[in-house]
Amino acid sequence: MKVGIIGASGYTGGELLRLLVSHPDVRLELATSRSLAGKPVSSTHRHLTGFLDLKYENPVSEEIRERCDVVFVAVPHGTAMNYVPELLDGSTKVIDLSADYRLDTPVFENIYGIKHSDPRKAVYGLVELHPEAAREEFVANPGCFPTGANLAAAPLAAAGLIDIAVFDSKTGISGAGISPTETSHYPNIAENIIPYKLTAHRHRAEILQELTRLDGKLRNISFTPHVIPSIRGILTTAHLFTKEPLSTGDVQEIYEEFYRDKPFVRLPGGVPSLTAVRGSNFCDIGFEADKENNRVVVLSAIDNLVKGASGQAIQNMNLMFGLAETRGLWLPAAAP
């Protein structure tokens, strides 16, 4: 299949290129950047030197549709909605990595403060919870924090066992994007941990949306992120206060059954490690029951650029074209 990437110069675009260049069913057709048109893709993604000879382009949507079977849209929030309508005006399939189509339109407009110009529905592409992504024409790829949080809590939410859910996530600085910020500036983040948006992070809406879909009575959900001096990875600690006491054995049975036949979710035992998932599309989950307080502590570890973004987008692409979801993604982590 012929693949295009709109907004290929950023971290998620670069990760799409890294993973797709060795995908056995993919031909990389184009990579776009308005500011870098004409320059080699490897001039910004030097790790891809010798693996592809693409140059950045800035074609119109009609040309993109004619040249590509599927397009990944990896542009900032509020920008994707300018591309998607024209890209879908034909047979080309689209996977959007921004937040523009993840939420119901009124919720998106309230949280992001942007008037939506194309309020169409898209399948939310967390494959483990939405197998209907298969054979779809348009998928909204989930956010990185919601991926880790929702995979951590989904089995207990689906069982109707959660009373209160509190999520604490630690993320590497690549989650801030390729443009330097105060948080990602080395003197500020080195040997430091920076909490931010303590009660009103916009990804909470995605967590709430997905967990209430599994349990319509669940409303008490809190989320606080922290940036840590690591390049990649998100470690989420979910404090799930349950309606009844559970043993660790009970939790093990629930999670094993829920994630049966879900190849990218692993239950390795013990505490998950960011190094065990770095560069891979896996989500590792561990847990321990606190029966005294009717609490289950669940930990999830993902690579924010892979399972939290580009790898998950390719997982969706595979299903959209009738391929095994592991195609081109069944790779071990780059540890240590």
UniProtKB/Swiss-Prot annotation:
<keyword id="KW-0055">Arginine biosynthesis</keyword>
<keyword id="KW-0963">Cytoplasm</keyword>
<dbReference type="InterPro" id="IPR000706">
    <property type="entry name" value="AGPR_type-1"/>
</dbReference>
<protein>
    <recommendedName>
        <fullName>N-acetyl-gamma-glutamyl-phosphate reductase</fullName>
        <ecNumber>1.2.1.38</ecNumber>
    </recommendedName>
</protein>
<keyword id="KW-0521">NADP</keyword>
<keyword id="KW-0028">Amino-acid biosynthesis</keyword>
<dbReference type="InterPro" id="IPR036291">
    <property type="entry name" value="NAD(P)-bd_dom_sf"/>
</dbReference>
<dbReference type="InterPro" id="IPR000534">
    <property type="entry name" value="Semialdehyde_DH_NAD-bd"/>
</dbReference>
<dbReference type="GO" id="GO:0070401">
    <property type="term" value="F:NADP+ binding"/>
</dbReference>
<comment type="pathway">
    <text>Amino-acid biosynthesis; L-arginine biosynthesis; N(2)-acetyl-L-ornithine from L-glutamate: step 3/4.</text>
</comment>
<dbReference type="Pfam" id="PF22698">
    <property type="entry name" value="Semialdhyde_dhC_1"/>
</dbReference>
<dbReference type="Pfam" id="PF01118">
    <property type="entry name" value="Semialdhyde_dh"/>
</dbReference>
<comment type="function">
    <text>Catalyzes the NADPH-dependent reduction of N-acetyl-5-glutamyl phosphate to yield N-acetyl-L-glutamate 5-semialdehyde.</text>
</comment>
<comment type="similarity">
    <text>Belongs to the NAGSA dehydrogenase family. Type 1 subfamily.</text>
</comment>
<dbReference type="GO" id="GO:0005737">
    <property type="term" value="C:cytoplasm"/>
</dbReference>
<dbReference type="GO" id="GO:0051287">
    <property type="term" value="F:NAD binding"/>
</dbReference>
<dbReference type="GO" id="GO:0006526">
    <property type="term" value="P:L-arginine biosynthetic process"/>
</dbReference>
<keyword id="KW-0560">Oxidoreductase</keyword>
<dbReference type="InterPro" id="IPR023013">
    <property type="entry name" value="AGPR_AS"/>
</dbReference>
<dbReference type="InterPro" id="IPR050085">
    <property type="entry name" value="NAGSA_dehydrogenase"/>
</dbReference>
<feature type="active site">
    <location>
        <position position="144"/>
    </location>
</feature>
<dbReference type="GO" id="GO:0003942">
    <property type="term" value="F:N-acetyl-gamma-glutamyl-phosphate reductase activity"/>
</dbReference>
